[in-house]
């Protein structure tokens, strides 16, 4: 979805800049409909791809942050309230507490 929005914005910008370059206003007719093509420079494509990667990375970190998982790798054990791993067996006594 974000890539299609970016493409539409670029199409609008390219039509505006080509109209300014020619000195006369160019309009798209009904016959041009689905056959409108956009030519981009290699540098522009690379920068757009970098921006899309940053957006995807940001959304992935938001999602995994909300779900309690790490982005890089899978966390095997559940974390307790104090940041320590919870024991995998129920009813066992932690070594930190000991018998009092």
UniProtKB/Swiss-Prot annotation:
Cellular component, GO annotation: extracellular space
InterPro entries: Tachy_Neuro_lke_CS
Protein origin, superkingdom: Eukaryota
Key words of the record: Amidation, Cleavage on pair of basic residues, Secreted, Signal
Residues that make up the propeptide removed upon maturation: 20-55, 85-100
Record keyword Secreted present: yes
Signal peptide: 1-19
Keyword Cytoplasm: no
Region Disordered: start-end pairs: 80-100
GO molecular function, one term: substance P receptor binding
UniProt subcellular location: Secreted
Any GO BP: positive regulation of cytosolic calcium ion concentration
Function comment: Tachykinins are active peptides which excite neurons, evoke behavioral responses, are potent vasodilators and secretagogues, and contract (directly or indirectly) many smooth muscles.
UniProt family annotation: Belongs to the tachykinin family.
Protein's name according to its UniProt entry: Tachykinin-4
């Amino acid at each position: 979805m974000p890539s299609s929005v970016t493409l539409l914005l670029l199409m609008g910008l390219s039509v505006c800049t080509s109209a300014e370059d020619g000195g006369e206003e160019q309009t798209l007719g009904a016959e041009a409909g689905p056959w409108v093509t956009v030519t981009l420079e290699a540098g522009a494509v690379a920068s757009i791809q970098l921006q899309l990667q940053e957006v995807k990375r940001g959304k992935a970190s938001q999602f995994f942050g909300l779900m309690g998982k790490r982005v890089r790798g899978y966390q095997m054990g559940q974390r307790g309230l104090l940041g320590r791993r919870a024991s995998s067996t129920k009813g066992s006594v932690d070594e930190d507490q000991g018998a009092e």
